[in-house]
Amino acid sequence: MKSYTSLLAVAILCLFGGVNGACTKNAIAQTGFNKDKYFNGDVWYVTDYLDLEPDDVPKRYCAALAAGTASGKLKEALYHYDPKTQDTFYDVSELQVESLGKYTANFKKVDKNGNVKVAVTAGNYYTFTVMYADDSSALIHTCLHKGNKDLGDLYAVLNRNKDAAAGDKVKSAVSAATLEFSKFISTKENNCAYDNDSLKSLLTK
């Protein structure tokens, strides 16, 4: 699903090419999910990811996110880096709580300083579910919607350490979701570059 993952990599907005894939209804949020630990303002790195149409997934993909609370609102800032072109992309979302561990993000594309490049567009949003999280790692499911149509499923393993390997607990969460970790694509060989200062500052924009 190249157009789906590429669309995420271009601030989750620009390269949609007509893909339609109903998202799973079986992404279950972690029981006892600790919102305060997950949304503490620190950076999560995407270390491994799985698109359910893997033949078209770009092999070189880097992403990170900061999730926190600003002015009483849950917010998420996403950063994407293309190691081939060295292009960087950012977007910022205010999150609507669907239930504990499940959120809808209405996003806007911004530059690193928070200046809006593409405003929030009705019908274009993503939903994500925190399927597992501890202090240092997480498994999330994301479904991107364009024109209120599902574009398909993307799973990502996150870590607070960009160089960390997935641990047994997060791998167990992958297995519990009836997924195979061996099918996830690692970002570790992608020569990823990150911009944590800008990413964290975008939570206040």
Swiss-Prot record:
Free-text comment on the cofactor: Binds 1 heme b (iron(II)-protoporphyrin IX) group per subunit.
CDD domains: lipocalin_NP4
GO molecular function: histamine binding; metal ion binding; nitric oxide binding; oxidoreductase activity
EC number: 1.7.6.1
Known tissue expression: Salivary gland (at protein level).
Cofactor(s) listed: heme b
Keyword entries, A-Z: Disulfide bond, Heme, Iron, Metal-binding, Oxidoreductase, Secreted, Signal, Vasoactive, Vasodilator
One GO cellular component term noted in the UniProt record for this chain: extracellular region
Main location: secreted
Compartments, as annotated in UniProt: Secreted
Organism domain of life: Eukaryota
Disulfide bond positions: 23-143, 62-192
Binding site for heme: 80
Catalytic activity annotation: 3 nitrite + 2 H(+) = 2 nitric oxide + nitrate + H2O
InterPro entries membership: Calycin, Nitrophorin, Nitrophorin_domain
Signal peptide: 1-21
BP-aspect Gene Ontology terms: vasodilation
Effect of residue 151 to R: Coordination of the heme iron center and inhibition of nitrite disproportionation
Extra remark beyond the main annotation: Superposition of the structures of NP4 in the presence of ammonia or nitrite shows a conformational change of the protein upon NO(2)(-) binding.
Role played: Heme-based protein that delivers nitric oxide gas (NO) to the victim while feeding, resulting in vasodilation and inhibition of platelet aggregation. Reversibly binds nitric oxide (NO). Also binds tightly to histamine, which is released by the host to induce wound healing. NO release is pH dependent and linked to loop dynamics.
Family: Belongs to the calycin superfamily. Nitrophorin family.
Protein name: Nitrophorin-4
Organism of this sequence: Rhodnius prolixus (Triatomid bug)
